[in-house]
């Protein structure tokens, strides 16, 4: 049955900012969906607040709204655009919850809009835990014994029936937010309290513990004619109790008997029918008791999920694309499989390889957080690898994480450590895989470890096999052909083999290649080689037959950014995808190398060829060799994927690989303190006084010379890893003592810290002769807060023309002095009217997508072409990629104002005592994602950015103010304006006195440190938790008040009210609150903004 003809326009709801539990996979699904809708001739409207996504590029939709995803805002878009239908299944939990709210508020009925891809009844059945329990029973399957509760009293009553431990799961939340395991009454009180708060329906499910059972997922699709396919089975390496997003997962499931698999399949098909998902995909999670074989259905997601992205990349079956076609009325047998072009989508994929996904964590960013893994997801990214067997895929996946200590360690284990390792492995943490493998290496048995961890014995045997292989490599001592072939089949890297045989990596590689032991590249074809594959999507294996086809033109290789992490996220993937698009359009063959299953760059049709490989020197050199053998390589781009490929630049150049764009020498010059200082001197530019220390004595001397406070950090880092502002010698000695390795190769850099400076960020293009300045961003928070966590505004709102001219001149001088070809990002600070250069990065930065969206100029595409020799003049002329005149520093006065705001994951991380980690910002980056607010003026744009970052500003109510002495004078005007608007101001001791002296009514309240009064009057933290305060404004002072402030900020984070910690942000918030009270909120698409901007620029040039 062909597609429906009654739909003319569709509104797609995106997933908003990247947060833990809802990441780049929804940009990948959303981008596919938009493509399908456009191909089918529909008018496409999109709402998504995240500017770092490919889907918000204006060419993917007819009207792109970068606006907060709230029911109120989406209603305004519906009223303006009048779509026929809404597709809410591709934007994660955010989109589903918004669609449900629009249905409940009567908005869908009012504007006669239909939901496609899922109906409300199916969403409710799948997401509402009580209803879903009924579904499972009607299908003749079991779910865990459970109680649904809405209050604390009900929770304690349920505990008597279920007994401890029990699982707590709130309804309608995502990534396990608010869930946990309660081992006793205190846990129950804490976790249920959070859960009731995070659940939009204040409903929580308590269920019997099935800890230690085996966990599986099936990824399904169903069409309206009741055709059902199982796309992929996924098995969790970790047993139940660890969120599937934090577990190592394997596809296809490896430890199920055929009979068990058929049972799961039958139950899944019954459930998907009963729930009524009839135009799309869903995933269903199961648990199996290893002792009795009892099967329990855990939950279902009636939408495209994180697992669907993994299943798509693992099988080559484009779930999101097919789900979108189903929502338009097609059936599975009418949709062709892109890869084979012969089979329809109703053919279930078969795999002749193993896929392993490994999570990447960021606990080093939150030293106070507890690294136990629970049902609340905590990982920030993931890497995926494919191999012909489990050991090969596992070792490749671990190598793809790029974390110190992520690969297995085969050095000998003393006997006395074994018992301790087994004991530690009982508690699931980020190190559990290594503890298990080391315990086995030290002589523990598979039975011992199964007893301790409940990890399936088959997986434990595989780890044992790796240990045995490592022992054989060590025993051999010499690099023989047989030993190397065997080691490679189990995924050992040259580096690991070198460590076991006391050779360095280069020697192993030389011998291996001389013996002709090279990987071959296999193709992901969805059908175990039954049909030919038309899309070259490859993975390496030490097998027999190579499947890389010949290519007529030399290829351009783009190195991706690897797994998402804090400091290197989707923004870098955006630049890689743009480069590939621009180069393909210009007629080049592009090759993408990456190992992140969530991203658009690893979609099989973004580049001419895709290699799903780790980004290590060994793996990248082998891909280059394969491309050389089959048609030659023009060069490699390392400047687009962040720090990951940049680190390989010099080694690749040493191996004779041509680097496109900025040279490795120029990259090194910008990172090297001394050489960069010479560039600044020659240009007459200043940087804050600084020095390089290799010991505490050095550091003390430098700090005394330049004066405290100082900013200390290791060299070569991204995301401010390990940075700190140090105010005195005692803290300096503590920092140096904790810094892992300080050597002459890895010195510590010490800079004068500029207090009260305005930070400025610039992205520019340089081709050797001309410069194009993409945009000048003014940071809202003061210098000292990491640029990735700071809100910023473009065009700048307080910088005069003279400052902008100085920034321009400095940018050009640095780009020329460093020798950039392509993108460069420079951070400046303006203090007492002196312009300081903080740092320069000769690569795509994390602000490139924001600048591109705010100004309508696609910077990464331009940079890729400059790398192949195109000039800025040509880009302004024949290529029409840059404006003919002017640039991002000369935007007219009526250009729209865009505000970028960071989104922080504090509510996910708790200390071992169960408290939220501190939300105070500093020089180390902690945000996982970003949003953009764009409007005619700064105040409304800032208000939009806060609403989009889930921090909507209040327009009435109570505001708590408590600031450090140094800030008291600067906040009086702002507080007075709020008081005049009718807000009640609540304050502690000192601040309250100052406000009263200035004629501002302030209600005094007790500090956290004072505790409750004898009359039972609570502290400010108690008031916040009781929901009596609508916004907290607290700037930290040194010492004791820091802990006072921490309790308060933790309370605000845990109940989700805005918590402002800098004066600059407070002043911006006051402007925004005034605007919210006076102006009607209007929605404008990026396409409309672009038209307004070009009209304004033409008028300015006329």
UniProtKB/Swiss-Prot annotation:
Residue numbers binding Mn(2+) 2: 299, 301
EC number annotated for this UniProt entry: 6.3.4.16, 6.3.5.5
Classification via CDD domains: MGS_CPS_II
Residue intervals passing through the bilayer: none
Binding site for Mg(2+) 3: 827, 839
Region (Allosteric domain): 951-1102
Positions annotated to bind Mg(2+) 2: 299, 301
Any one of the GO BP annotations: L-arginine biosynthetic process
Keywords assigned by UniProt, alphabetized: Amino-acid biosynthesis, Arginine biosynthesis, ATP-binding, Ligase, Magnesium, Manganese, Metal-binding, Nucleotide-binding, Pyrimidine biosynthesis, Repeat
Pfam families, A to Z: CPSase_L_D2, CPSase_L_D3, MGS
Region (Oligomerization domain): 403-546
Positions bound to Mg(2+) 1: 285, 299
Listed name of the protein: Carbamoyl phosphate synthase large chain
Originating gene: carB
């Amino acid at each position: 049955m062909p597609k429906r003809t009654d739909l003319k326009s569709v509104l797609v709801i995106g997933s908003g900012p990247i947060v833990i539990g809802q990441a780049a996979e929804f940009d990948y699904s959303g981008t596919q969906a938009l493509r399908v809708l456009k191909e089918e001739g529909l008018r496409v409207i999109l709402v998504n607040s995240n500017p770092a996504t490919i889907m918000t590029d204006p060419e993917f939709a007819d009207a792109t709204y970068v606006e907060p995803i709230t029911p109120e805002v989406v209603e305004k878009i519906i009223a303006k655009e009048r779509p026929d239908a809404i597709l809410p299944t591709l934007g994660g939990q955010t989109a589903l919850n918004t669609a449900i709210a629009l249905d409940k508020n009567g908005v869908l009925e009012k504007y006669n809009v239909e939901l496609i891809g899922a109906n409300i009844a199916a969403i409710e059945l799948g997401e509402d835990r009580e209803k879903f329990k009924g579904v499972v029973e009607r299908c003749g399957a079991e779910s865990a014994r459970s109680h649904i509760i809405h209050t604390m009293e009900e929770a304690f009553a349920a505990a008597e029936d279920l007994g401890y431990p029990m699982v707590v799961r709130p309804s309608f939340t995502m990534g396990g937010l608010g869930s946990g395991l309660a081992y006793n009454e205190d846990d129950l009180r804490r976790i249920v309290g959070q859960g009731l708060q995070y659940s939009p329906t204040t409903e929580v499910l308590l269920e019997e513990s099935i800890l230690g059972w085996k966990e599986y997922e099936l990824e399904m699709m169903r069409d309206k004619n009741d055709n059902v396919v199982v796309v992929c089975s996924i098995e969790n390496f970790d047993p139940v109790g660890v969120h599937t997003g934090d577990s190592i997962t394997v596809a296809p499931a490896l430890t199920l008997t055929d009979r068990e698999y058929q049972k799961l399949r039958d139950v899944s098909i019954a459930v998907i029918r009963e729930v009524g998902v009839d135009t799309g995909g869903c995933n269903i999670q199961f648990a199996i008791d290893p002792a009795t074989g009892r099967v329990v259905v855990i939950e279902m997601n009636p939408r495209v999920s994180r697992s669907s992205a993994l299943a798509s990349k693992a099988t080559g079956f484009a779930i999101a694309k097919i789900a979108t076609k189903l929502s338009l009325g097609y059936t599975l047998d009418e949709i062709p499989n892109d890869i084979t072009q012969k089979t329809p989508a109703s053919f279930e994929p078969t795999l002749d390889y193993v896929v392993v996904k490994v999570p990447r964590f960021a606990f080093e960013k939150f030293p106070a957080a507890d690294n136990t893994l629970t049902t609340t997801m905590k990982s920030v990214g993931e890497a995926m690898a494919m191999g012909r067997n489990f050991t090969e895929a596992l070792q490749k996946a671990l190598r793809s994480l790029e974390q110190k200590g992520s690969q297995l360690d085969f050095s000998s284990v003393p006997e006395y450590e074994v018992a301790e390792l087994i004991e530690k492995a009982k508690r699931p943490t980020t190190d559990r895989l290594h503890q298990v493998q080391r315990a086995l290496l030290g002589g523990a048995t598979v039975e011992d470890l199964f007893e301790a961890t409940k990890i399936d014995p088959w997986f434990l045997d595989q780890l044992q096999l790796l240990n045995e292989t490592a022992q054989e490599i060590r025993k051999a001592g010499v690099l023989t052909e047989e030993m190397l072939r065997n080691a490679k089949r189990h995924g050992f890297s040259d580096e690991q083999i070198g460590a076991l045989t006391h050779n360095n990596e280069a020697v192993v590689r030389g011998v291996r290649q001389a013996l002709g032991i090279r990987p071959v590249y296999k193709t992901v074809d969805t059908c175990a080689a039954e049909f030919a594959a038309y899309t070259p999507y490859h993975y390496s294996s030490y097998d027999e037959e190579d499947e890389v086809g010949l290519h007529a033109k030399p290829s351009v290789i783009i190195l991706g950014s690897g797994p998402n992490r804090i400091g290197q996220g989707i923004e870098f993937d955006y630049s890689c995808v743009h480069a590939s698009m621009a180069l393909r359009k210009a007629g080049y063959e592009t090759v993408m190398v990456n190992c992140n299953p969530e991203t658009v760059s690893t979609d099989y049709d973004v580049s001419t060829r895709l290699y799903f490989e780790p980004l290590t020197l060994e793996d990248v050199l082998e891909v280059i060799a394969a491309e050389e053998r089959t048609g030659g390589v023009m060069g490699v781009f390392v400047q687009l994927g962040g720090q990951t490929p940049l680190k390989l630049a010099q080694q690749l150049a040493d191996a004779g690989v041509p680097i496109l764009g900025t040279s490795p020498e120029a990259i090194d010059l910008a990172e090297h303190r001394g050489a960069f200082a010479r560039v600044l001197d020659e240009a007459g530019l200043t940087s804050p006084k600084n020095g390089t220390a290799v010991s505490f004595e050095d550091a003390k001397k430098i700090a005394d010379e330049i004066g405290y406070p100082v900013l200390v950090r290791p060299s070569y880092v991204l995301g401010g890893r390990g940075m700190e502002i140090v105010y005195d010698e005692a803290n300096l000695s503590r920092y140096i003592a904790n810094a892992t390795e300080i050597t002459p190769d890895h010195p510590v850099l010490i800079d004068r810290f500029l207090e009260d400076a305005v930070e400025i960020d610039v992205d520019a293009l340089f081709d050797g002769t001309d410069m194009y300045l993409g945009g000048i961003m003014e940071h809202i928070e003061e210098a000292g807060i990491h640029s990735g966590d700071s809100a910023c505004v473009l065009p700048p709102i307080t910088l005069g023309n003279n400052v902008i001219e100085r920034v321009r001149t400095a940018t050009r001088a640095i780009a020329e002095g460093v020798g950039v070809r392509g993108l460069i990002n420079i951070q400046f600070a303006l203090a007492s009217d002196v312009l300081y250069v903080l740092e320069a990065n000769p690569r795509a930065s994390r602000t490139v997508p924001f600048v591109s969206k705010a100004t309508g100029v696609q910077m990464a595409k331009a940079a890729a072409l400059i790398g192949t020799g195109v000039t800025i003049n040509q880009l302004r002329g024949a290529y029409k990629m840059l404006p003919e005149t002017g640039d991002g520093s000369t935007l007219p006065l009526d250009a729209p104002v865009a505000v970028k705001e960071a989104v922080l994951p504090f509510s996910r991380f708790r200390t071992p005592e169960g408290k939220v980690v501190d939300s105070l910002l500093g020089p180390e980056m902690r945000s996982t994602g970003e949003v953009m607010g764009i409007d005619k003026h700064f105040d409304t744009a800032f208000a939009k950015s806060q609403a989009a970052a889930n921090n909507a500003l209040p327009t009435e109510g109570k505001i708590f103010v408590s600031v450090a002495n140094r800030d008291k004078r600067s906040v009086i005007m702002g507080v007075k304006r709020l008081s005049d608007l009718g807000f009640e101001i609540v304050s502690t001791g000192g601040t309250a006195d100052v406000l009263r002296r200035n004629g501002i009514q302030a209600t005094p309240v007790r500090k956290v440190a004072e505790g409750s009064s004898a009359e039972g009057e609570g502290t400010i933290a108690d008031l916040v938790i009781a929901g009596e305060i609508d916004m907290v404004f607290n700037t930290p002072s040194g010492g004791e008040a820091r802990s006072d402030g921490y309790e308060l900020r933790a309370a605000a984070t845990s109940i989700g009210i805005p918590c402002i910690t800098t004066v600059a942000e407070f002043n911006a918030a006051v402007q925004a609150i005034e605007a919210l009270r006076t102006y009607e909120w209007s929605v404008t698409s990026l396409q409309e903004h672009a038209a307004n901007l070009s009209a304004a620029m033409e008028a300015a040039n006329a």
